[in-house]
Curated annotation (Swiss-Prot):
Lineage: Eukaryota, Fungi, Dikarya, Ascomycota, Saccharomycotina
GO CC annotations, alphabetized: mitochondrial inner membrane
Cleavable signal peptide: none
Mitochondrial matrix side: 17-471
Family per similarity comment: Belongs to the chaperonin (HSP60) family.
UniProt cross-references to Gene3D superfamilies, sorted A to Z: GroEL, GroEL-like equatorial domain, TCP-1-like chaperonin intermediate domain
Name of this chain's protein: Mitochondrial chaperone TCM62
Location within or outside the cell: Mitochondrion inner membrane
Topological relation to the membrane, as annotated: Single-pass membrane protein
Mitochondrial intermembrane topological domain: 489-572
Species whose genome carries this gene: Saccharomyces cerevisiae (strain YJM789) (Baker's yeast)
Description of how the protein assembles with itself and partners: Forms a high molecular mass protein complex of approximately 850 kDa.
Chain ranges passing through the membrane: 472-488
Gene: TCM62
Length: 572
């Protein structure tokens, strides 16, 4: 009787219980948890290895119904595709309750997200293949000493590559390298024109912009001077129309301009009207840099002046730029001495007008106190280029040369959009992903050859290691470093298993760092002259990211995931 009552009570409690969300917690002592975490990266490895080295990837974008083709040379778009894949996995998990209880899928997404965060922009076949191979070896021997051996092997490779990186300096060598890196003579000629415009000083990826053009041929536009990190004030449509920005898309003034720096928010028209009158009579334009905002009556006066001068064929215009402290290394206008010197402000930081502290309002009467000058400006709402030539006699405090650079815009031409997109992606990758990093910090042989060159040193490191399990970790690195070359030779040349092994053995035995065989029946070639190079900094960052991810995954003992709430539908 009592047993039956308890059974009924238990059934009643079960029916009336409230279901609550739980937080899945996984212990990494269970190796299956780590294997599930690696599953997402294995999927990524299949995608990357099958679309690298002259291969292409077909995918359907998020907001397009037709499939798109991504070349292996277009690293930026390939990285965006992987980000879209990660986002789609996360959205599917949030909207599908069944997937929330699917442990392998959940852990695979977590592992993939951590890997992408660690590897950052160095998403290559090398990073994915090394990570998967090294962790598979660790799963066989999950010991801390094995992890130490893996880290020691990766650090040895990084040191080895740093000591042997190849510096390419002469213009002839750079031109020869460009010839090998490009797919057509038109691409190489355009890249050489860009390099010549900047005197072959391509040491940053923000010097050259590659965009789609609207003609059948390529155009090179050079913007000299200070690359200002903010564009024209875009908070007022009437002001933008007064500069004809909606139609011309660009404000370009190639004559001497007055410069006025204003510390604070400019609202009162009386603070700017004397300057407007002075500039209109001189028929000169004004560059107004505001540390704050320009609004109210002041902006209205500026707009009216621009429209009036346009009707009267007066060249005077007022271009308003906002000063961004964050974009100027957290320097206030008064602290940014290099910028003040560049603008040729007559009294240094004392020429910055402050309505609270300055005794005089800028005008013709005190022009020698407030107004600087620049020789030309090119500006949009996104950025601006200010130019002043450096003259040691005219400017006692000479501006450092590093603050004056040529910024080149290369507009890619073609007969159709597909051709333009393909050429833009290839040229952009060559300039801003390969050449800029390689010319700045050095090159190493590509196709995984540089990793093969480190194998003799890894063997010595392994032989001198007294701890057996640490040797196992170094041996895992020895097994993993040949994988990038296997993928490269298979995808790029279509070699079979025996030919690939022969080429790998030849590269290991060749003592000269830049020399390697790329055909089973040929002699070793110089990778510098042959153009088979990649930036050292990219490989170094890749190895550092792999090491960080492995250390992160093997050092934690708990993985805590979350259950996503289904998005709520808001009633209209």
């Amino acid at each position: 009787m009592l047993r039956n009552c308890l059974r009924k009570l238990g059934n009643h409690q079960t029916k009336c219980s409230v279901k609550t969300l739980h937080t899945p917690i996984y212990r990494t002592k269970n190796l299956q948890v780590l294997r599930d975490t690696l599953s997402g990266i294995k999927l990524l490895e299949k995608i990357i290895t099958s679309s690298s080295y002259n291969k292409t990837l077909i995918y359907e974008p998020k907001y397009k119904s037709k499939p798109q083709v991504v070349s292996s040379h277009d690293t930026m778009r390939l990285h965006n595709v992987m980000r879209e894949l990660l986002d789609s996995l996360q959205v599917d998990e949030a909207t599908n309750t069944r997937l929330q209880s699917n442990r392998p899928r959940k852990l695979g997404r977590v592992g993939l997200q951590l890997f992408m965060d660690c590897i950052q922009d160095n998403l290559t076949a090398t990073s994915t293949s090394l990570t998967c191979s090294l962790l598979e070896h660790y799963f066989k021997y999950p010991e801390k000493e094995v992890t130490n051996g893996i880290k020691a092997g990766l650090r040895y490779i990084r040191d080895f590559l740093a000591k042997n990186k190849i510096i390419v300096k002469s213009q002839n060598d750079v031109d020869a390298l460009v010839e090998q890196l490009t797919m057509s003579s038109s691409d190489s000629q355009s890249i050489k024109r860009v390099l010549k415009a900047i005197n072959y000083e391509l040491f940053s990826d923000d010097i050259v912009r590659v965009i789609n053009g609207n003609k059948t041929y390529d155009e090179v536009d050079v913007s000299k001077g200070w690359k200002y990190p903010a564009g024209i004030l875009d908070s007022n449509e009437a002001y933008l129309r007064s500069l004809e920005l909606p139609t011309k898309k660009l404000v370009s003034i190639d004559k001497d301009m007055l410069v006025l720096m204003y510390d604070g928010t400019l609202r009162d028209a009386n603070k700017i009207l004397p300057t407007i009158t002075y500039a209109r009579k001189l028929r000169k334009s004004i560059l107004l840099i505001v540390n704050g905002d320009c609004t109210g009556d002041a902006l209205t006066s500026v707009t009216i002046n621009n429209n009036r001068n346009k009707r009267e064929n007066n060249e005077s215009r007022i271009v308003v730029l906002k000063y961004s402290k964050k974009a100027n290394n957290d320097l206030a206008p008064q602290e940014n001495l290099d910028f003040i010197k560049f603008l040729r402000l007559p009294c240094g930081y004392d020429s910055i007008y402050s309505p609270e502290y300055s005794p005089l309002v800028p005008s013709k009467m005190c022009a020698d106190k407030y107004y600087g000058s620049i020789e030309s400006i090119k500006a949009t709402t996104g950025e601006a280029f200010l130019y002043n030539s450096i003259d040691a006699e005219a400017i006692p405090n000479k501006v450092p040369k590093s603050f004056l650079q040529n910024t080149v815009t290369l507009s890619i031409g073609g007969h159709n959009e597909i051709e333009i997109d393909r050429r833009r992606n290839a040229i952009d990758n060559c300039l801003n992903n390969v050449l800029c990093h390689g010319l700045a910090k050095g090159f190493i042989p590509g196709y995984g050859i540089s990793l093969l060159k480190a194998i003799p040193g890894l063997n010595e490191l392994k032989a001198n290691e007294p701890n057996f399990m640490t040797k196992v970790g170094i041996n895992a690195v020895l097994s993993a470093v040949i994988l990038p070359s296997e993928v490269a030779f298979k995808n790029a040349y279509g070699y079979n298993y025996y030919e690939i092994n022969s080429l790998i053995a030849g590269a290991i035995n060749e003592k000269s760092f830049p020399m390697a065989k790329f055909s089973p029946n040929s002699e070793p070639v110089n990778t510098v002259k042959d153009g088979n190079l990649e930036p050292w900094s990219k490989m170094d960052s890749c190895l550092a990211g792999v090491e960080t991810f492995i250390e992160l995954l093997t050092s934690c003992n708990t993985i805590i995931t979350c259950v996503y709430k289904k998005p709520e539908r808001h009633k209209a």
